[in-house]
């Protein structure tokens, strides 16, 4: 609860002087605290409340009173100044005190969630390593099965045009058969990867729940979104590998057809050229597929880093605390900030409700 309040308010301190910062301030000042807590969080970004300045000031003062215990014993939160600029400056001062007290707590939460997500990355590594190994084995198998340079090949070519055409026809059949066979070999690997993602992400849900700053409902949504994204990317990777094999088959088949046309016109068939074509096409398949698997691994890193920031935001001093606001994408950055704030209001509302239930179930703690 303390972490999400600090993170939400510290955003105001970070974005407090440019036009983008003014827009962020407007987000707070146009949404009353009481309605933000009790209403549906997903509607906050869409409401355009036109309350009076006095009402907004009253809400901000109430908010600082709620932060009183976080500022330390013996310190009463002062009332806000009676002008907008004074409010900004005073809030920044208050935030400095609150943030300094909660910085270690937020850093610890961020690190704990990060450790759990690193565990997920390590659990998924064997699946991608297995895929890489299978690509290498498949290339070796195709290289062996499509080999055309040998004593028997040379003898067959010396026999004349008919023998050369028979060799090319056999080569065409082998290309079709073995590429289709390799395509089938990749299906179990894709299924294991998808199943592994679902299993390990659910394990992540259980392990990260005690450390996440998010409400249980938002935690569940974040985890489900992560599972959906990684599953879709895994299926896309499998589709890409199948497409690479189709391309390999089509390119080799096209080269063989050209060679067949030449042989029918009386051109001599060079087995060395055919062998070199096979080698180059297989190398291209291996190179492209390795890059796609590496891109999938990088996507896992990016998605898990994003969910770490969603579930346990870094402390304000962290370099990744707030997104960069460039001139070209300021609207996009502000949209991301508004989305984050909507999430934070939901977490704050849950935290207050949870504290209310705790007080009701513990009368002594409430009276003391």
Swiss-Prot record:
Q: How is it modified after translation?
A: Phosphorylated by FAM20C in the extracellular medium.
Q: Which residues carry this modification: Phosphoserine?
A: 52
Localization per Swiss-Prot or TrEMBL? Secreted; Early endosome; Late endosome; Golgi apparatus, trans-Golgi network
Q: Which UniProt keywords apply?
A: Chylomicron, Coiled coil, Endosome, Golgi apparatus, HDL, Lipid transport, Phosphoprotein, Secreted, Signal, Transport, VLDL
Tissue expression? Liver.
GO cellular-component term (any): late endosome
Q: Where is this region: Disordered?
A: 305-333
InterPro entries given in the database record:
ApoA_E, Apolipoprotein_A1/A4/E
Q: Which domain of life is it from?
A: Eukaryota
Give the coiled coil ranges.
231-255
Q: Does the keyword Iron-sulfur apply?
A: no
Gene3D superfamilies listed in its UniProt record: Apolipoprotein (1.20.120.20)
Q: Name one GO molecular function term.
A: lipase binding
Any GO BP: triglyceride homeostasis
Q: How does it assemble?
A: Interacts with GPIHBP1. Interacts with SORL1; this interaction leads to APOA5 internalization and sorting either to lysosomes and degradation, or to the trans-Golgi network.
Q: Additional comments on file?
A: Mice expressing the human APOAV transgene show a decrease in plasma TG by one third. Conversely, knockout mice lacking APOAV have a four time increase in plasma TG.
Q: Which family does it belong to?
A: Belongs to the apolipoprotein A1/A4/E family.
- What is this protein's name? Apolipoprotein A-V
Q: Which organism is it from?
A: Mus musculus
